[in-house]
Structure formats: C-alpha cells, structure tokens
Amino acid sequence: MNAPRLIVGLGNPGPEYEATRHNVGFWFVDQLADKLKVSLAPQAKFFGRAARTGETWLLQPTTFMNRSGQAVAALANFYKIPADEILVIHDELDLPPGGIRLKQGGGNGGHNGLKDIQAKLGTPDFWRLRLGIGHPRTLNLSQQVVDFVLHQPRKEELPDIEHALARCLLAWPKLAAGDFAGAQQQLHGKAV
C-alpha cells in the first residue's frame, strides 16, 4: 500500500470549537505537526491550515465540518493525490470514548464531514482513522447528537480520548510507511 500523502484532521475553526468532541481530528493533526516539527499555516487556496513535511501534507480545513470536502479536494487535486493516499481523522459516535478504528472506504455513518469529502472526491475510497467520542445515548446523556459533538468531553471521557490520540501517534511510523495492516493491528489491539 502507498504511504498517505495527505493527512486531514476534521474539525471546526475558531476558539469556541477548539476543545469540542467534533474537533478530535484537529487535535490529532496538531499533535502530529508537533511530533514532525512542522507548523500549520493558513493556505487560502486549500481552504485550511496546512503544513508539508517531505511528500506528506497535513491539513485542517477551515471551511467548517460540513464543507470539509472543499479543502480536501482542493489540496488533493492540486497535488494529484489519489483517494487511497488520503487519511482522514475524525470523531466517531459509534465507538466509545478512546476507541480507535482504521479502515479504508465505506459509508459515512451520518458524519457530514465525511459525506462532503466523499461527494467532492467522487469516491469513498480514502482511509479513515476513527476516534471514538461515544454517543450521548450510550453514555446515558440526554443531549441531542448535534449538542453532544459541539461540547467538550466530560472529565471522565477526556483521558480515554487523549490516550487514543497518543496510541495513534505511536502508530504514525507504520502509517507513514504505508503499513496500514500493521497500523490496524497495533491500533485495534488491546490498549497499553
């Protein structure tokens, strides 16, 4: 498998969204940028904040979640990056806080950011790193989903999400080498 050339963290721009569950994709890209010693900077032609390290781009769309595809398609089309060399990191309601799943293709699970990326790329065949935030129903909360994702994780959920982010960073060497099977094995195994 080819190494990913575009790493996209999904989220919403602005300080009011910074610490929300919906922004865990941004959190990952921020941490990865720190690890790789690169700085994200505004890139108007790509509708987001971006950084390049070697042949790999990091991107945080600033289009708001529901229009993430505009940014992803702009950068992917400009650099001729095929869908199977794109890794999108996003919040996942169907996994408990701290759950992780890496997969290629599939549906969008009602996630509007993924839905827009699929529409703008014309294919669902990009890779996804799904970071569990839980669902209000399974966490016994009365919030609607829209409310839930736009709020900060509760203090008892945050350590699990932070641990998942750390595990994803530990898997980065495998991801960067295109060893998705090895990364899946590492990420889907028991947490350490």
From Swiss-Prot:
The gene is pth. GO terms for cellular component: cytoplasm. Its EC number is 3.1.1.29. One of its GO terms (molecular function) is peptidyl-tRNA hydrolase activity. InterPro entries: Pept_tRNA_hydro, Pept_tRNA_hydro_CS, Pept_tRNA_hydro_sf. Hydrolyzes ribosome-free peptidyl-tRNAs (with 1 or more amino acids incorporated), which drop off the ribosome during protein synthesis, or as a result of ribosome stalling. The keyword Metal-binding does not apply. Its main location: cytoplasm. The record marks D91 as: Stabilizes the basic form of H active site to accept a proton. NCBIfam families: pth (TIGR00447). Belongs to the PTH family. HAMAP family: Pept_tRNA_hydro_bact (MF_00083). It comes from Dechloromonas aromatica (strain RCB). It catalyses: an N-acyl-L-alpha-aminoacyl-tRNA + H2O = an N-acyl-L-amino acid + a tRNA + H(+). This is Peptidyl-tRNA hydrolase. Monomer. The active site is at H22 (proton acceptor). SUPFAM superfamilies: Peptidyl-tRNA hydrolase-like. It is found in: Cytoplasm. The keyword Transferase does not apply. Keywords: Cytoplasm, Hydrolase, RNA-binding, tRNA-binding.
